Amino acid sequence: MSRDDLARLEEACVKAWDQHDADGFASLLTEDCVVIDDMEPKPLRSRDAARRYAESWFTAFPDMRVQEKNRVIGDDGMAVELELKGTNTGPLEMGGTRLAPTGRRITAGVNVFMKARGGRIREIHSHSDSLSMMSQLGLAGSSAPA
């Protein structure tokens, strides 16, 4: 894939998340994709598991917006810095635990690294500022303003 193709793939991924389009997100992935998220107990190892993962975030934060802050496109992958903003009004699936909605608003940074194969994303590594997110939700330490 060219760097322009990779850039378009990354843009489509961010757009799918911003528009809460779990099926659109899943369509960008290889069937055997792997999603590794710091807040998940183990890697997700299929397109369907990745779709369910996205749906869980859209349920937890139905007003969530995703904005790209920075990106780097390489020969076979992309790195993107994102900012997530939303209100936790639905149950949050995190680390194998289901957390009740807090009603609190968050602003959180997420760094995502993606590898591509054959025009689709084959691997995603997501690293979020989980301490800040949990604090803003009132679930860890002092609560920072959103």
Predicted regions and their residues:
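C-terminal and inter-domain tail/linker signature
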Residues: M1-A146
